[in-house]
Amino acid sequence: MAAAAWSRVSQLLGRSRLQVGRPMSSGAHGEEGSARMWKALTYFVALPGVGVSMLNVYLKSHHEEHERPEFIAYPHLRIRSKPFPWGDGNHTLFHNPHVNPLPTGYEDV
């Protein structure tokens, strides 16, 4: 099996640039088939995908809010050895005050 694979690789590498380009030139003749394929992909993949995404957003907007878990100040979490280079130095770059606690606890929002 390895010998057959090696033989195939050596054949492909041994071809001239012109010979490698010939099999690919047949793709230019199927323009009608290509347009039909993209039209089918649009109708049967893209539009249903957008519909499923819209349904997901609708269902998530009607979802109940969860209560925040109680804050427990574990010593191995939220260690700040030096301040962050943005803002007040205590908030992470994508800090969300509703979800992410600071080292001292949740912010009152």
Curated annotation (Swiss-Prot):
One Pfam entry name: COX6A
GO biological process assignments: mitochondrial electron transport, cytochrome c to oxygen
Pathway: Energy metabolism; oxidative phosphorylation
Cited Gene3D superfamilies: Cytochrome c oxidase, subunit VIa (4.10.95.10)
SUPFAM superfamilies: Mitochondrial cytochrome c oxidase subunit VIa (SSF81411)
Highest taxon of the lineage: Eukaryota
PROSITE patterns per the UniProt record, alphabetical: COX6A
Keywords recorded for this protein, A-Z: Membrane, Mitochondrion, Mitochondrion inner membrane, Oxidoreductase, Transit peptide, Transmembrane, Transmembrane helix
InterPro entries cross-referenced by the UniProt entry: Cyt_c_oxidase_su6a (IPR001349), Cyt_c_oxidase_su6a_CS (IPR018507), Cyt_c_oxidase_su6a_sf (IPR036418)
Predominant location category: mitochondrion
Ranges in a coiled coil: none
Transit peptide: 1-24
Membrane topology: Single-pass membrane protein
Protein function: Component of the cytochrome c oxidase, the last enzyme in the mitochondrial electron transport chain which drives oxidative phosphorylation. The respiratory chain contains 3 multisubunit complexes succinate dehydrogenase (complex II, CII), ubiquinol-cytochrome c oxidoreductase (cytochrome b-c1 complex, complex III, CIII) and cytochrome c oxidase (complex IV, CIV), that cooperate to transfer electrons derived from NADH and succinate to molecular oxygen, creating an electrochemical gradient over the inner membrane that drives transmembrane transport and the ATP synthase.
Family, per entry: Belongs to the cytochrome c oxidase subunit 6A family.
Record's protein name: Cytochrome c oxidase subunit 6A1, mitochondrial
Organism: Oryctolagus cuniculus
Taxonomic classification: Eukaryota, Metazoa, Chordata, Craniata, Vertebrata
Gene that encodes the chain: COX6A1
